[in-house]
Amino acid sequence: MDNKLRNTIFVLFLCLSFSVRAQLKDYPIQGVTFTQVKLDDKFWLPRIETNHKVTIPASFARCEETGRVKNFDMAAAKSGKFCTVYPFDDTDIYKTIEGASFSLSLYPDKKLSQYIDTLIMKVAAAQEPDGYLYTARTINPSAPHEWAGPERWILERDKSHELYNSGHLYEAAVAHFLATGQRNLLDIAIRNADLVCSVFGPGSDKRHVAPGHQVVEMGLVKMYRITGKKEYLATAKYFLEQRGHHPYDAKSNNPWMNGSYWQDHKPVVDQDEAIGHAVRAGYQYAAMADVAALTGDEKFLKAIDAIWNNVVSKKIYVQGGVGALGDGERFGDNYYLPNESAYNETCAAIANVYWNHRMFMLHGDSKYIDILEKSLYNGLISGVGMDGKSFFYTNVLEVKNSSHDQHQESSRSGWFTCSCCPTNITRLIPSVPGYMYAQQGDKLYVNLFASSKSKVTINKKNVEVIQSNNYPWDGDLKFSINPASSLPFSLMIRIPGWAQQQAIPSDLYTFSNPSSSKASLTLNGKPVEYKIEKGYAVLTRTWKKGDVVSVNLPMDVQRVVANANVKDDAGRVAIQRGPLVYCAEWPDNSGRTANIILPQGIALKPELKKDLLNGVVVLTGDAAAVTVDALGTTISTVKQPIVAIPYYAWAHRGKGEMTVWFPEKVTSVDLNSK
């Protein structure tokens, strides 16, 4: 796709967005689209390139090999037998098309574009005349998949995933339209969305259901933005409002019996705790933010504010993962954050990024980007290997030789029977530049840091912003501001919470020995006074071409301790430097990590290892290791060097032990791990 076409599509997107915003309210802050940011860094750009060259082709290949594509062919022919396991397997194709569309916006690829068109033709052929699209039924309506039910929609709340499939179709269609300007997938999505809106809604002549797996709400909002069809937004809001009205057993502790697994235990506006399936929840909260922004419904906003506070103060892991329980892939009770059995589905981390970005656009507070960054740099990208074709479904915080948890993954896999996470990765990675900047009137927010060149428009004037840095390894940040002509506006540079001695925006985690170092800022080489507003350094002035802002974020090695209510982390400490949480892995630590202790006062120093794990800063120092003799009767402690690597980089060198939370005393060591 040439630049002229790309610019035309971008203008079309802006026009559509503005037409919708003119009809109703919207987010007060708007993200700068990822196509306006050209990366030139050594951290994200290689990952985005690998996603384009390896992850997306591998994902499409697996969809072919496993029969996901064949299901569409059979649905078109109305013959055969559904040949994969789950009725939501259709979405792996949709999500990969979405990711590929994002990638096409960055890397024009005629061959990839043609392949996507071939897939879209198959999807179109599988769609029924009234817009219904669900291969698990259409292949053989008289004998559909067992989760589908004997007729359309009848098992939607429980397990059919019909509306879940539709939601991912909508998101893929919007992404493809914006990337290519083609309507082939968008028209399929419109026919399906029109059907959904005609079937579901208020009134005795329509069906009433709380969708079994949220995402259709987010998809309908995106369709509304593109088409301006108000019924899409209304139906998204309606689906959210259907929750909490089904006759469950409120006295039951079983999440499937009381409705909490589906977040269906209370009306959404009355919910104040993150509960149930973590991915479903994250998509719901993101959709609630969308609806709050677009309708001005304060009740939605109040609810997600309360839920966010619950997650950040009681239910998020130190590396940004959410969803502690493998049983139902759910949030656990408050402060229940086990390490060895941590589930932390990669999809849940992705949903958490979506939700926190929306919370930022509602409130303009950097604390939401702090959480987004924590998830993004740690518990999310750990979900994809550096080769681009191996994945974690779950993201554990501790592996011991004695580990036996059934959900624990100690190595990545190329694919899964339920492969929602790999295909979700394909669409998240290329969208990362879209989280870097945002605008509100004459305010330009800088949220994430990566060497790049960006073009934005402020008060109808073009402004080029060039970032130069080696983030996340180095805290020296340089911003070159180049307006087309002198222009007054406010530059809002995020000063991360970790650079202000805050481990997380709650008391769930704290730095045990906060550094006295503070962020510093210069303008054109001279120190400048600035004020902090909601976590942002605010520089308001008339900017001229060639202005340079330099920021130094202190990258001290910090010891992190958990709230005393987190029993699994009692007497233990985690290590963080900048946005990165660190772990010890067996290859660097004499084959063991479960026996390492980090007494108070141990100093760890950063050291760049260019040839290790695609280039990382490791932390080294003198720790101690506990050993037990062969008879199990004598314990000894020996001085031992420790090497810690970024958490995201573990499990690239074979199976073995890994530790995030280190005991500070011998009494906290698990002596049964040998």
Where are these regions (language model features)?
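Aromatic (Trp/Tyr) and acidic
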Residues: 23-110, 114, 144-179, 214-231, ...
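Long, well-ordered core segments of solenoidal/helical folds
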Residues: 47-79, 116-132, 187-204, 235-251, ...
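C-terminal beta-rich recognition modules with glycine/proline-rich loops and embedded aromatic residues
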Residues: 236, 304, 370-378, 383-480, ...
